[in-house]
Swiss-Prot record:
Family to which this protein belongs: Belongs to the peptidase A1 family.
Function of the protein: Possesses protease activity in vitro.
Protein name, UniProt field: Aspartic proteinase Asp1
Tissue expression pattern: Expressed in pollen, nucellus, ovary wall, shoot and root meristem, coleoptiles of immature seeds, and somatic embryos.
Signal sequence range: 1-23
Name of the gene this protein is made from: ASP1
Amino acid sequence: MTARLALLASLLLLLQLVPPSSAVVLELHGNVYPIGHFFVTMNIGDPAKPYFLDIDTGSTLTWLQCDYPCINCNKVPHGLYKPELKYAVKCTEQRCADLYADLRKPMKCGPKNQCHYGIQYVGGSSIGVLIVDSFSLPASNGTNPTSIAFGCGYNQGKNNHNVPTPVNGILGLGRGKVTLLSQLKSQGVITKHVLGHCISSKGKGFLFFGDAKVPTSGVTWSPMNREHKHYSPRQGTLQFNSNSKPISAAPMEVIFDSGATYTYFALQPYHATLSVVKSTLSKECKFLTEVKEKDRALTVCWKGKDKIRTIDEVKKCFRSLSLKFADGDKKATLEIPPEHYLIISQEGHVCLGILDGSKEHPSLAGTNLIGGITMLDQMVIYDSERSLLGWVNYQCDRIPRSASAITSRL
């Protein structure tokens, strides 16, 4: 009896020593088209105010448009964030050094020794100052205010400032020291550097931090390139309609970027994809004819005899693509069915949601981005603890029951 009690006491002590896994789960809104954003509502400040932030695994810094005062800003939901200048990060602080390390730029101090920065994006740029304020994350007892460093963007470039934007800023979920995930882990809010998102084609979804929501089975895993600054698996080959011969001339370096609405291929794989798609249509679906779309972002579209309302109406005319990532003798396959690369436009046309990156921006030349359209109806997991990328088909419009709480499990 004494031995059993001693064993039980040892087990209880062990359970106390093992840190629990945890997860913060947030509801997602938006769609690929026509909104072009997937965003969460983040409550920031004291008192907390809601702001819509675009989830972006391709960016490290979280930032929102703010009245610093603002030089160039869009019309945003909930208005501009108004910072308290006493919360501005100084150039001498480690947070500023971490920011510039993530940006891979030499540090430049701004006025009053404040940590100013400039970020270039494919669709524009943002200049701002690093701020610290409270993020009220969902918790079982209401909210859990957490002090987070983020960007106060007061000058947005290359944007039409007269056109409202559906989001206030960006939730930086990339690989770096100033990412929201890194800060949450360093403060003990989560115990594992793991995040995942699940974007529904029905316009809903969820985002989670920590590993408590990762499925225990069924996930396809691929090792991440440890040397890459973005979430990138090993090089992959592109195949069409399950053919054994790849249509990509060489292995493709691929980046998973939830901040990209569409998927972007480098010049050769893009033209190879376009060629096989057009060839299939010319043989099997001649009723679809190529047409110029009013939306300039959609560069290749087809019209039918009548307006096309759903992808199901034309799905039989298209074939699946697949990306196969090699890991020694093993291969991890990302299936890309037609509904994960096609869009029905407001004109009632079916359009290719894979774009030529070299035409969009010089920085995308030679780059292959897996964007939101190709991640639909899948849970995509970024496990920096094990340096793995994972994906599994999932019913993303069903938010986990614990979506309003921070949950824990051993």
